Amino acid sequence: MRSFLNLNSIPNVAAGNSCSIKLPIGQTYEVIDLRYSGVTPSQIKNVRVELDGRLLSTYKTLNDLILENTRHKRKIKAGVVSFHFVRPEMKGVNVTDLVQQRMFALGTVGLTTCEIKFDIDEAAAGPKLSAIAQKSVGTAPSWLTMRRNFFKQLNNGTTEIADLPRPVGYRIAAIHIKAAGVDAVEFQIDGTKWRDLLKKADNDYILEQYGKAVLDNTYTIDFMLEGDVYQSVLLDQMIQDLRLKIDSTMDEQAEIIVEYMGVWSRNGF
């Protein structure tokens, strides 16, 4: 049975402070709705979801989470942003859609801590924060989405990136390249083109055909356009080279965001 819980008051909410939302252990979390006022989403920085002190997902600012929800056309409302652990865009193959979506719920049975951490910018006018949890019967953490970001320098011309982590047994659902000058991207595995060099306009149109919103200054390689987990890239031990070839019209720093999926463990990725 799904239930709804007003989470405890968030301590240390003030401009310039670091804060943590501590989720009660023993529940399975489907969605966390974070309400905010007196602070902009861009002023809530270095957002980290941690299980037992280990990073699960990170966002440069809370606005990046809003953009993630925008891309999937999830409900967006001013003054609140939602952490969707259950993924409503997923479609079942051998199971129902609901089973597939709930497979990614954040179980906490057996954990010691489960936290959402962030920093509040010193320029925030008068921040106020509260959170509501949508939760269900407790389970241990299993399949989860793990969002990681990396910063790379792009050249005016072609830049090859071949050092993204390849944790064996995990999957890649999507790769996002956030940079204004990205013109086209090719994706290779062990020298084989999985995705040819596609111009951003052509890639954007493909995303739109599958019901995804296109984000400004972002080139998204979505391996699960139909919401099918089996279309994602399985990182097996045979893969020796995973490579992005990025054509850019300027020298700039890019944020590379990789959405990994896999079974969480204390000793895992």
Curated annotation (Swiss-Prot):
Domain of life: Viruses
Key word Transmembrane present: no
One Pfam family, short name: P2_N
Gene3D superfamilies: 2.60.120.730
GO cellular component: viral capsid, major subunit
Key words of the record: Capsid protein, Virion
Stretches that traverse the bilayer: none
Subcellular location(s) per record: Virion
InterPro entries the record matches: P2_N, Viral_Major_Capsid_sf
Assembly behavior: Homotrimer.
Function (record text): Major capsid protein.
Protein name according to UniProt: Major capsid protein P2
Organism: Pseudoalteromonas phage PM2
